[in-house]
């Protein structure tokens, strides 16, 4: 039998937006949703203050939410992917440095011997 969890150890369920997007574990999701919500309020309220049309202001607010959320999402994911590529390149460089250090394949060693000649 599996041991029952103790009362003070509650199992934490992830928060899923619309049952699809796991906001806690997906990179950039939380920030995108928060900025989209703020963009929705600003655009909807701003449009209402200018035109005093309620229905159109709600539509503008929804559009603002979609545009700001997608804009933040793509910007953040692009930066996240760029950072992962840079980390991978650095990791491979460090691995090669460790692997080839003090061997006849070491590029720094070849440069030093060519300069001293």
Curated annotation (Swiss-Prot):
Entry-annotated residues carrying N-acetylalanine: 2
Annotated transmembrane regions: 33-50, 60-76
Keyword Acetylation: yes
Gene Ontology CC entries for this record: mitochondrial inner membrane; mitochondrion
Membrane-side (Mitochondrial matrix) residue stretches: 51-59
InterPro entries: Cox20
One record GO biological process: mitochondrial cytochrome c oxidase assembly
UniProt topology in membrane: Multi-pass membrane protein
Location in the cell: Mitochondrion inner membrane
Source superkingdom: Eukaryota
Keyword flag Cell cycle: no
Mitochondrial intermembrane compartment segments: 2-32, 77-117
Keyword field: Acetylation, Membrane, Mitochondrion, Mitochondrion inner membrane, Transmembrane, Transmembrane helix
Function as written in the Swiss-Prot or TrEMBL entry: Essential for the assembly of the mitochondrial respiratory chain complex IV (CIV), also known as cytochrome c oxidase. Acts as a chaperone in the early steps of cytochrome c oxidase subunit II (MT-CO2/COX2) maturation, stabilizing the newly synthesized protein and presenting it to metallochaperones SCO1/2 which in turn facilitates the incorporation of the mature MT-CO2/COX2 into the assembling CIV holoenzyme.
Subunit structure of this chain's protein: Found in a complex with TMEM177, COA6, MT-CO2/COX2, COX18, SCO1 and SCO2. Interacts with SCO1, SCO2 and COA6 in a MT-CO2/COX2- and COX18-dependent manner. Interacts with COX18 in a MT-CO2/COX2-dependent manner. Interacts with MT-CO2/COX2 and TMEM177.
Recorded family membership: Belongs to the COX20 family.
Protein's UniProt name: Cytochrome c oxidase assembly protein COX20, mitochondrial
Organism, as annotated: Mus musculus (Mouse)
Gene from which the chain derives: Cox20
